């Protein structure tokens, strides 16, 4: 157990909170990793801690992504900013501007995933990062995908210099290996488990 703690890092990794609100958290990852649901859960956690979060729907490719975010946000009492099928970079910028204007102190950008890491996705995510300069980039990784999770983590970290990882579906026996490998490959902390 102590070896595990040493490997994973003993310090408790928290979200970086901006001194000038809103704090912008960009959620990235492969399709099906659980970005939308777990991003909303994270926003819910921040709400419980007294923050005023806003969810921003930047995934314009998956047909039900915006609706899913609205449903999950609605269940948690968290508003969702969306502009339909617009350009994701414009949506991110408008969402952050809306948050500033309306007094939200946290913004969670739910970005598009793909089945595999591809150039178009990485370019879009890099453009969103450049446009809104997020305080935190969290990579959402499905622990059940094993080596794929490790490869994805490496690719996303190289492109975006992620700040941390949110591991989802960490409920089986062989799932801890993904956590250790992702941490080893990126050197970034596992900040949340969904």
State what each model feature region is:
Residues 33, 61-63, 88-89, 113-117, ...:
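Short, small-residue-enriched loops and turns at beta-alpha junctions
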Residues 93-96, 104, 116, 123-130, ...:
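Conserved phosphate-handling catalytic cores of large alpha/beta enzymes
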Residues 1-58, 65-85, 91-111, 124:
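Primarily NTPase-proximal linker/entry elements flanking Walker-type ATP/GTP-binding cores
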Residues 29, 57-60, 112, 140-143, ...:
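Conserved residues at beta->alpha junctions
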Residues 13-15, 58, 113, 119-120, ...:
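Flexible, active-site-adjacent loop/turn segments at secondary-structure boundaries
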Residues 83-87, 140-143:
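Short beta->alpha junction loops
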């Amino acid at each position: 157990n102590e070896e595990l703690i040493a490997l994973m890092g003993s310090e408790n990794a928290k979200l970086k909170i901006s001194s000038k609100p809103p704090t912008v958290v960009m959620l990235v990852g492969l399709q099906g990793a659980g970005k939308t649901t777990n991003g909303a859960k994270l926003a819910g956690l921040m709400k419980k801690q007294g923050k005023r979060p806003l969810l921003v729907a930047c995934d314009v490719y998956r047909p039900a992504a915006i609706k899913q975010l609205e449903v999950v946000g609605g269940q948690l009492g968290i508003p969702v900013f969306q502009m339909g099928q617009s350009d994701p970079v414009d949506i991110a910028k408008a969402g952050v501007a809306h948050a500033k204007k309306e007094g939200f102190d946290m913004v969670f950008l739910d970005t598009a995933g793909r089945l595999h890491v591809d150039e178009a996705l990485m370019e879009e995510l890099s453009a969103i990062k450049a446009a809104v300069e997020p305080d935190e980039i969290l990579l959402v990784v499905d622990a059940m995908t094993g080596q794929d999770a490790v490869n994805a983590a490496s690719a996303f970290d190289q492109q975006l210099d992620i700040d941390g990882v949110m591991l989802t579906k960490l409920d089986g026996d062989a799932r801890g290996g993904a956590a250790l490998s992702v941490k080893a490959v990126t050197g970034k902390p596992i900040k949340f488990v969904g």
